[in-house]
Amino acid sequence: MAEGIDRKMDDRMEFTTSADVTVAPTFQDMHLKENLLRGIYAYGYESPSAVQSRAIVQICKGRDTIAQAQSGTGKTATFSISMLQVIDTAVRETQALVLSPTRELATQIQSVVMALGDYMNVQCHACIGGTNVGEDIRKLDYGQHIVSGTPGRVADMIRRRNLRTRHIKMLVLDEADELLNRGFREQIYDVYRYLPPATQVVVVSATLPYDVLDMTTKFMTDPVRILVKRDELTLEGLKQYFIAVEKEDWKFDTLCDLYDTLTITQAVIFCNTRRKVDWLTDKMREANFTVSSMHGEMPQKERDSIMQDFRQGNSRVLISTDVWARGIDVQQVSLVINYDLPVNRENYIHRIGRSGRFGRKGVAINFVTSEDVRILRDIELYYSTQIDEMPMNVADLLT
């Protein structure tokens, strides 16, 4: 099913766009392939979101594009529709490549592409670490129109010559702020070096700090910019609160007191380290609370199974590191708890954007010790938002 985009928020979003960007009010106005239109409508979209109505036509024209919009505004479908429009399915070669910072996000993009391209006979493969290399090789040798992957595995497949790059027309960097941070920067350059010189580059993210925009000058030519103004970056419709916790040790008791509230729908609890995730999961289970947990060092099969259980509602409380924060779409999540405030303020919007997806009610609760007050104030200033102390009736806000 498509993201049910929050139209009220969408209508109020302010965009700073390059002068020649027009707005396409309907998908028909974008002159898309008939079978792609069928897939878009079957997926549940009726009309384009604000970012879709601005970015899709520009990307389809072949322009390098920087698109920034909040979580839950249809960013994934923006570049998925664009890729499906420009590829030639008669040519069984990789023509579009998407790089994402996490395996889960890369897999989710693959499923969106397959759903939107349902009537096009499109081949799309998720090329991610932690999976069988032999399966990657088999799929890539068969021929994939679109590859969605994580930078390390994609670079490896290109070096092995199993992922052939000579037909690639478009490179998409999703959650570009995270991708271009130190951890992935070199791998991105590794991949980019192998691409044809005329490859179009599309950069998509909820946050685009200046250093990222600066970096894009190295591999983009005269890009179209579709940027949400900073002041519009508060996730409208989400209620944000803090709970003052005198010391770190007391966070656990506070969380136990909140457990009944957490399970009204589904909740995600964020910690900053995998060690903290494991510790908190064990402590919660010892206290007879049902929780599941996930972090980047778990085997991929285990991560997939945990994600599936959570998506299906079999588990209701998930404890995770930031591996889960970026772009993962689970419709029923109404509550996010920052057990630890994020080290990087850019990640705050990615974390709390997991709750109240697409116009549903959502609540974010931040546990704040005296050492955290400065970080909380910094987040408030950065996003021009106000985070109030949590009221007693928080359960009522979720129902």
Curated annotation (Swiss-Prot):
Keywords: ATP-binding, Helicase, Hydrolase, Nucleotide-binding, Nucleus, Ribosome biogenesis, RNA-binding, rRNA processing. A motif (DEAD box) lies at residues 174-177. ATP binds at A69, Q70, S71, G72, T73, G74, K75, T76. Residues 56-226 form the Helicase ATP-binding domain. Gene3D superfamilies: P-loop containing nucleotide triphosphate hydrolases. Residues 237-398 form the Helicase C-terminal domain. GO terms for biological process: rRNA processing. InterPro entries: DEAD/DEAH_box_helicase_dom, Helicase_ATP-bd, Helicase_C-like, P-loop_NTPase, RNA-helicase_DEAD-box_CS, RNA_helicase_DEAD_Q_motif. Belongs to the DEAD box helicase family. DDX48/FAL1 subfamily. ATP-dependent RNA helicase involved in 40S ribosomal subunit biogenesis. Required for the processing and cleavage of 35S pre-rRNA at sites A0, A1, and A2, leading to mature 18S rRNA. This is ATP-dependent RNA helicase fal1. It comes from Botryotinia fuckeliana (strain B05.10).
